[in-house]
Amino acid sequence: MSILVDVKTYLALDGAPKHVQDYLSVAVTDHAYLPKTEDITSDWVAYIAAPAFKLIRENLGHDVEAFASIGTGSGIDVLTGIELLGAKRVGFTDLQKSVVTAAAENIKKNLKNADSVELEFGAGDLLQPLQNGKRRYDVIYENLPNVPLTDNTKIEDKRNSGHYLEKRVEAIPEFVHEQMLDLHYLALKQARDYLADKGAVYSTLGGRVPLSAFIKLGELAGLSSEIFTYSWKVQAEPEDVISGYAAQEKAGLGPFRFYRASDLQKAFADISVKESGKNAFEIEKSLESSKLTATEAYEAFRKGEVIGHTVAVLKSSVK
């Protein structure tokens, strides 16, 4: 399928985009994550990544040279990195060749000047497809799935990009696995070999576990981590995702935390993106009495309530 994206609206730009077309024509393969362009508050790139990218650019005071995305899907996150960060070289990966090939075409055809950006890409596990490239990325972005596929489901069967194959050969700390942060940990472990000097990984993480768990995640991966931005969003694909967390909760993981969207809206009402990171733990504390377990959240969802979760952008860099 193909979608049309109004960039000015999608990225909340003050004027016309500088580097990408005004309207993106994006082909989305059957196995790629489908952007939520009809409801931007549910869209990871527009609602979570884009504000963080703008803040990165503001803090740096200049464009970045190189940007990478792990698990790009349609490539819309890479186009966002090009537009908001001014990246001249981009690397991107995804698990399946068909997804990466489509993403590359999407990126090329939606640039105002296709020759202005160097592309490095490949299909495979996390950052490994980029191992023979230039590496040294200033910004590495990842929004990887947390919920494993059920045993009888294959990654190729349907649009399973919100899930991952649980069987891994790498050693994963028990703490990380209990918090369902396996892929984020593995991405951080790999990333140190792909970062430029003073580069950082920006992990977009659904706050279904305590913020302290994210800081510990970075430490266990051998990096120095901080909460860069903190916000919330309505749970996308709630039937699938919340029930998935509830099942993992019953299996002994977690407990996980969700909230009614109305409670999240109140807690974040007066919080700017710029101030959100430094106030994250205080905001989390204010929501303590409103949190729901995954099981409770699923029951509330089945009764018609709108369920959401907090979102942290974790900034991790080499110590």
Each language-model region and where it sits:
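Short, surface-exposed amphipathic charged segments that create phosphate/polyanion-binding patches used
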Residues: 239-249
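SAM-dependent Rossmann-like transferase core, predominantly class I methyltransferases
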Residues: 2-89, 256-258, 262-315
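Mobile active-site "lid"/loop adjacent to the S-adenosyl-L-methionine
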Residues: 139-183
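A generic structural motif
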Residues: 118-123, 225-239
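C-terminal beta-strand of the catalytic ATP-binding
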Residues: 144, 316-319
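Conserved SAM/SAH cofactor-binding pocket of Class I
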Residues: 44-152, 156
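Conserved Class I SAM-dependent methyltransferase catalytic core
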Residues: 177-233
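Alpha-helical transmembrane segments of integral membrane proteins
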Residues: 248-257
